[in-house]
UniProtKB/Swiss-Prot annotation:
InterPro entries: Asn/Gln-tRNA_amidoTrfase_suB/E, Asn/Gln-tRNA_Trfase_suB/E_cat, Asn/Gln_amidotransferase, Asn/Gln_tRNA_amidoTrase-B-like, GatB, GatB_Yqey_C_2, Gln_synth/guanido_kin_cat_dom. This is Glutamyl-tRNA(Gln) amidotransferase subunit B, mitochondrial. GO terms for molecular function: ATP binding; glutaminyl-tRNA synthase (glutamine-hydrolyzing) activity. Gene3D superfamilies: 1.10.10.410.
Length: 528
């Protein structure tokens, strides 16, 4: 199942679609939620993962065809991609560089010599009759990615070891037509460059598996290695699950984080049931995921003999021993480092908010610029910037159900609005309304904040001061109290949140020109 495409903040952050399934007489319900999940005593969970990552190159791995995922079918395919006789592969150096960047980021040992091999099988998605991969001498080995409780939502620190990283070509895409039973083959994906990253079976909890996948995707996207678009197949995963040291079961072609977690959780429960109640042991086999349960596709006895042998048309890759060290010096700061920085002074963001900004580079840069203007130049509190970006700015886009677009209002203009609120030239309520109007109206984006305030008559009350202002506020509050005695009774009986209703009515009466805090103080004084 696909994850929700739009990420909401605060209490809705990183919500995923949930589902459940039933298996065997025990009626075990499997949901995508892992809150409170624990392996059963005596049945330890053991898991490894293989992630196939499409590289974000201009051209394909062994041809000059464009690597364009959104193109019309079969418009980005050369003679070699179609598997025509007489065509010769030539390695794309850009793909090699991106694969090396990924290997360095995962702290892997780069092989000084690596080579390509042919993996033979016959299927519609492989026009050559074999896949070019790296079976005998992969590009990199012995890497790792560390998970920490504060940043990765795991219970304890854990290092996940990467067994190897290999460079290989993707297959063609099969599109099944349920109406007439035909299959269309799109060769645009054939020969698209991939890296296959294989971990050791180090996962002992589903939270570790989820954290690793999210962190890996964030890392590859941040480095420009991959688009990170799982929905369109930029990353595809296979997981290997075993229980209590028994045979492992591979679940192939999982296309989202929620699918990975649901499939692994279901498969663990299935194996535990077999061990508890079955007369036969868990078989070593390959299974697929149908959205509710895993389905057997082939057993160990049915395993394909791929007849690997070296590809004589491609020379070995020979790299200088210092290539890993040299490349590491060219990498930007990694997501974990940036998140850590945003959680410390002078920013002091929550981890979930810092991660959201880092995973959206345009928004990250926007926040840093706004922070510089508001905090460094105008000496306002960091809390002001954090609240405006996380709750007001992103929140306004979410309320309108439109993607966040930082180009709608530049940082100088948003800073101007924030500063005018701090100087009490406009109330916070009016400022929110004005921001929403700017997002909705392209014409208003051309005007300055002061001009917009004048145009919509949103300026704070400036012609009444001191005791006169207090008296005016008291009069409005008294009228609201008289009009809503039932709400006042609720407040006096302990339902203090009901005061927000009264504040809202008062704000409406004054068209948002008076600060809501002033009304709150007065209501509390009058109600007692």
């Amino acid at each position: 199942m696909e994850e929700k495409s739009q990420v909401q903040l605060d209490s809705h952050i990183f919500n995923t679609t949930s589902s459940s399934s039933q298996y065997y007489p025990l009626n075990v319900m499997i949901s995508r939620s892992i809150k409170g999940w624990r392996p059963e005593p005596g049945y330890p969970f053991k898991c490894g993962i293989e992630i196939h990552t499409q590289l974000k190159t201009k051209h394909k791995l062994f041809s000059l065809s464009k690597n364009s995922p959104g193109a019309a079918p079969n418009t980005c395919a050369s003679y070699f991609d179609f598997g025509l006789p007489g065509t010769i592969p030539k390695l794309n150096p850009e793909a090699l560089l991106l694969a090396l960047r990924a290997a360095v980021a995962l702290k892997s040992d780069i092989s000084s010599i690596s080579s390509f091999d042919r993996k033979h099988y016959f299927y519609m998605d492989q026009p050559l009759g074999y896949q070019i991969t790296q079976h005998y001498q992969p590009l990199a080995k012995n890497g790792h990615l560390s998970l920490v409780p504060r940043l990765d939502d795991v219970e304890e620190a854990k290092t996940i070891h990467v067994e190897q990283i290999q460079l290989e070509q993707d297959t063609a895409k099969l599109n099944y037509n349920a109406y007439d039973g035909t299959v269309d083959i799109d060769h645009n994906r054939a020969n698209v460059p991939l890296i296959e990253m294989v971990t050791k079976p180090d996962f002992s909890h589903l939270s570790e598996l989820r954290a690793f996948v999210k962190k890996y995707i964030s890392l590859m996207t941040h480095l420009g290695v991959c688009s990170g678009d799982m929905e369109n197949g930029a990353l595809r995963c296979d997981v290997n699950v075993s229980v209590a040291g028994g045979n492992r079961v591979e679940i192939k072609n999982l296309g989202s984080t929620s699918e990975i977690i649901a499939a692994a959780k279901y498969e663990y429960a299935r194996q535990v049931q077999l061990l508890k109640h079955g007369k036969t042991p868990v078989e070593q086999e390959t299974r697929s995921w149908d959205g509710t349960k895993t389905i057997r596709t082939r057993s160990k006895e049915d395993a394909i003999d791929y007849r690997y042998f070296p590809d004589v048309e491609l020379p070995r890759i020979r790299l200088h021993p210092s290539i890993g060290k040299d490349l590491s010096q060219t990498l930007p700061e990694l997501p974990e480092q940036l998140i850590q920085q945003l959680c410390e002074e002078p920013f002091l963001l929550e981890v979930k908010h810092a991660r959201f900004l880092v995973e959206n580079p345009d928004l990250y840069n926007y926040y840093k610029n706004l922070h510089h203007i508001i905090v460094d130049k105008h000496k306002l509190s960091y809390k002001v910037v954090n609240n405006w970006i996380i709750h007001e700015f992103i929140g306004a886009f979410n309320k309108l159900d439109i993607p966040v677009d930082v180009s709608v209002i530049d940082t100088e203009k948003l800073a101007s609005l924030i500063i005018m609120v701090s100087e009490k030239k406009i109330s916070i309520t009016s400022a929110k309304l004005l921001l929403t109007q700017i997002l909705q109206s392209p014409e208003d984006r051309e005007l300055s904040i002061p001009d917009l305030i004048d145009a919509y008559d949103l300026g704070a009350v400036n012609d009444i001061h001191g005791d006169d202002l207090k008296e005016a506020i008291k009069e409005v509050c008294s009228e609201v109290i008289d009009s809503h005695p039932d709400v006042v009774t609720k407040i006096r009986n302990g339902k203090t949140k009901s005061i927000n209703f009264l504040i809202g009515r008062a704000m409406k009466e004054t068209q948002g020109k008076v600060d809501s805090k002033e009304f709150e103080k007065m209501f509390k004084k009058l109600i007692g």
